[in-house]
């Protein structure tokens, strides 16, 4: 299965590694030298989590990002799914 949050749709992003040497001028240094940029990936912090749905009387397993899990713990699963225009039936 893909490395993707099933609720928010967050997935791996791509960017650059930027190596920096030296002290910046505003911090009292001569200058800061930036080396060769190389490609890198930013992976999503995914967690396999089991949620109990009292309306259905059963549990569902969802792969969620840590950020989404924080929001779910604050406002609840039903409210978070409604906010992201998802339905519980999609995860059964």
Swiss-Prot record:
Name by which UniProt lists this protein: Large ribosomal subunit protein bL28
Record bears the keyword Ribosomal protein: yes
Keyword check for Ribonucleoprotein: yes
InterPro entries linked: Ribosomal_bL28, Ribosomal_bL28/bL31-like_sf, Ribosomal_bL28_bact-type, Ribosomal_bL28_sf
Family named by the database record: Belongs to the bacterial ribosomal protein bL28 family.
Molecular-function GO term, any one: structural constituent of ribosome
Gene Ontology cellular component terms for the protein in this record: ribonucleoprotein complex; ribosome
Disulfide bridges in this chain: none
Keywords associated with the record: Ribonucleoprotein, Ribosomal protein
Organism superkingdom: Bacteria
Signal peptide: none
Organism per entry: Borreliella afzelii (strain PKo)
Xref: Pfam families: Ribosomal_L28 (PF00830)
BP term (GO), one: translation
Classification of source organism: Bacteria, Pseudomonadati, Spirochaetota, Spirochaetia, Spirochaetales
Annotated gene: rpmB
